[in-house]
Amino acid sequence: MKLQGAGCVVAAVLGALFIVNVESHFHKPELQLCKAFGEPCISYDVRSTIGPRCWFKLEFPREKCCNENGKRQSPIDIPDVKSIYKVPQKLRYSSRKFVGHLENTGIQPAFKRKVGADKVYLEGIGSPVGKRYFIENVHFHVGVRHKERQTENTLNGRSFDGEAHIVHIREDFGDLKEAANHPQGLLVISIFLSTSKGERRRDGFDDLIEMIQDVQEFEEEDGPCANVKIPDIFKFKQLIPFHPVWPICKKTFPVADDSDNSGSGVVCNFYLPNGLCGEKKESKINPNELLADDPEYYVFNGGLTTPPCSESVLWLVAKQPRKVSVFYPYVVRNMETQREGEIIGDFGNLRPLQDLNDRPVFLVRFRLKRNWEHGDTAANDNDAMDSPFSVLGIN
């Protein structure tokens, strides 16, 4: 489909995704915004008093953004979108080397940016306030074996074999803790993973999946669930026959925190680059190999899928899945979690789907990449530093 007329695009997108070009106006009363620091002891067991249905009451009000009544919660079932907005920019990274370490956070395997290493910026898209985004981590999600749903987001009801999230921080905030407290302070590129079909395998994901085998263990004594008494599961079903299994959530449930309450403590913390979550596997990857070959992405506003669930994320979800090793689901499911004796495969690490709430979802096609894996960077490509939405009259 050809690029939409400027008038139609401005009317549709300006009034929906980005609204205005002044950040102060983004702070709408309905947005749930929370800083991302500390890490609560959580479970993905929907019956548990520390499960997804109760996340919003874990150390309330700090985790209040996990309230499922929020208007921009994630993940979602992405609806079928017919119209494609074509933009002239290529979506790619400023460097072919992202240096970091893989660790088991007790929630998911995460490849985190090395502290002090050069930041790798996403090029071809910017924020509505003219700022770039840099990579902070790449982490993975999977469901319970034999369950139909294996991804956090779904595509018109369809799931794949897993999902990778490439998390970016807006450069004017510097760290994830602060960025999570601002609309579009974060940008997440989501790639569906398939063991049977999809875009051809690349070393980027293959290398990360191979490393996951070396970080299966989690040091529970250093984690947020250490020395925390978890309330017994207590369900409405015990009181009302045939009622769905729902836990009774405990308000102000005690959770582990950073030692100095600032986000720079010494306990395991998913949101810190040096979160001390057990063994680390240091390496480097070419981040361009993580992006979709066919650069079509669903674009919408949403939130983090783990506490604090802040509605601060601009999501780009690739339309086509990436083919990966058949061992991917197994190595992720076999990882130990925050809770002693539990592995990810017991309950998966997928937050329940959240309501779309009439959010607009756009299908955006970036310009095809040609030789980016062979060193063709965007350093001298003038249009690559601008947001593609500037073509649509947004910036």
From Swiss-Prot:
Function: Reversible hydration of carbon dioxide.
Subcellular compartments: Secreted
Signal peptide region: 1-24
Domain of life the protein comes from: Eukaryota
Tissue specificity: Component of the acid-insoluble and acid-soluble organic matrix of calcified layers of the shell (at protein level).
Residues annotated as domain Alpha-carbonic anhydrase: 42-365
Binding site for Zn(2+): 139, 141, 165
Catalytic activity: hydrogencarbonate + H(+) = CO2 + H2O
SMART domains listed in its UniProt record: Carb_anhydrase
Protein name: Putative carbonic anhydrase 1
Ubl conjugation among keywords: no
Entry keyword set: Lyase, Metal-binding, Secreted, Signal, Zinc
Cited InterPro entries: CA_dom, CA_dom_sf, Carbonic_anhydrase_a-class
GO molecular function: carbonate dehydratase activity; zinc ion binding
Family as reported in the entry's similarity comment: Belongs to the alpha-carbonic anhydrase family.
Obligatory cofactor(s): Zn(2+)
GO cellular component, one term: extracellular region
Enzyme class: lyase
The enzyme's E.C. designation: 4.2.1.1
